[in-house]
Amino acid sequence: MYNRNILIEQTDPEIFAAIAAENARQEQHIELIASENYASPAVMAAQGTQLTNKYAEGYPGKRYYGGCEFVDIAEQLAIDRVKQIFGADAANVQPHCGASANEAVFLAFLKPGDTIMGMSLAEGGHLTHGMALNMSGKWFNVVSYGLNDKEEIDYDAMERKAHESKPKLIIAGASAYSLRIDFARFAKVAKDVGAIFMVDMAHYAGLIAAGIYPNPVPHADVVTSTTHKSLRGPRGGIILMKAQHEKAINSAIFPGLQGGPLMHVIAAKAVAFKEALQPEFKVYQQQVLTNARVVAETLVSRGLRIVSGRTESHVMLVDLRSKSITGKEAEAVLGSAHMTINKNAIPNDPEKPMVTSGVRIGTPAMTTRGFKDEEARITANLIADVLDNPRDSANIDAVRAKVNALTKRFPVYG
């Protein structure tokens, strides 16, 4: 029998120390990685429940194990809530991550050697959309689309390539693209060439849930997403689909790709979806957009260039070449000043992928901890202060002190 009073710090002090150190880092650093956020205590509590003990292969009401009547309730709540959020016909909440969700779509509709079309990783796409080293690039013939000279999606070139290559599947979505995506335009092209239209909305899902970024669900055959990032849930994936595709997608997830679903994570997804249905979630997402605009405008005023000239979402790419610093160097020096970002290639980047000429900045996490316009402006100026003198240790120390004072005023978990 387990004793609930015996906790991690007693049974595994090494792991407890690592957890405590990571908690301190999250509280002390300004989190600016666009794909990261802070899950609520309720979401984290759901992940720590006894639901982790339950095997539940199959779907609610159709399990291969007994004793699933209560985990069925949790999964059905997650399904119903995510359908309500996005207006979807059907939903699968079992994918372990966004990549698994994307792979399930490929398994449902494609055969090895089929042609797919996705956004080039070098111009803002995601590695699961056809990158050469990813299974999507190894198993399928990939035709990529990219940006025009204004650094906006080149819809005309995309349409032309689609008619030339006749892909079986067209993917819209990105991991480093700051503007709105015209899902209706993609849908028309897909229909014209007879392709399945898939949207990976992982980065934009929270904004879409709040109704402040275009919703792809009315236009796409299938929509995949992560449940963390801007949606602010646990780490995991979902697939939304037209009713006629539900059987194929469900079979692709189980038994096609996965066995037992993670019922504790699915319960946490349900909690996050309920949070996303509340009025305050829209207020939060509106502030995410405002903070991103303020950060972008402030960085421009300090001599930095924003790829595409602006942001219309939570994310932006920053061209660092005017500061004579690489993305790799900027990531390290900003980290030492307690601001966490990630290096990121910019379009036509002359540097290697592990070096880069840019960084990606996002505002979901800073907004969760309570930052508004003024704090966003302060943060952007602190970023610029570091980039103006990245090798001056006194400058880094001064910025770090200001960051620590700011994060102390706005604790994540109190």
Swiss-Prot record:
The family annotation for this protein states:
Belongs to the SHMT family.
Q: EC number(s) in its UniProt entry?
A: 2.1.2.1
Q: How does it assemble?
A: Homodimer.
Cofactor needs = pyridoxal 5'-phosphate
Q: Where does (6S)-5,6,7,8-tetrahydrofolate bind?
A: L121, G125, H126, L127
Q: Which residues carry this modification: N6-(pyridoxal phosphate)lysine?
A: K229
Q: Name one GO molecular function term.
A: glycine hydroxymethyltransferase activity
**In chain numbering, where does the site feature Plays an important role in substrate specificity fall?**
H228
The protein's superkingdom reads Bacteria
Q: What class of enzyme is it?
A: transferase
Supply the gene name: glyA
Provide an example Pfam family for this protein: SHMT
Q: Which InterPro entries match?
A: PyrdxlP-dep_Trfase, PyrdxlP-dep_Trfase_major, PyrdxlP-dep_Trfase_small, Ser_HO-MeTrfase, Ser_HO-MeTrfase-like, Ser_HO-MeTrfase_PLP_BS, SHMT-like_dom
Reaction(s) catalysed (UniProt annotation)? (6R)-5,10-methylene-5,6,7,8-tetrahydrofolate + glycine + H2O = (6S)-5,6,7,8-tetrahydrofolate + L-serine
* Protein's UniProt name: Serine hydroxymethyltransferase
The protein's matches in CDD domains, at most eight in alphabetical order, are given as: SHMT
Keywords recorded for this protein, A-Z: Amino-acid biosynthesis, Cytoplasm, One-carbon metabolism, Pyridoxal phosphate, Transferase
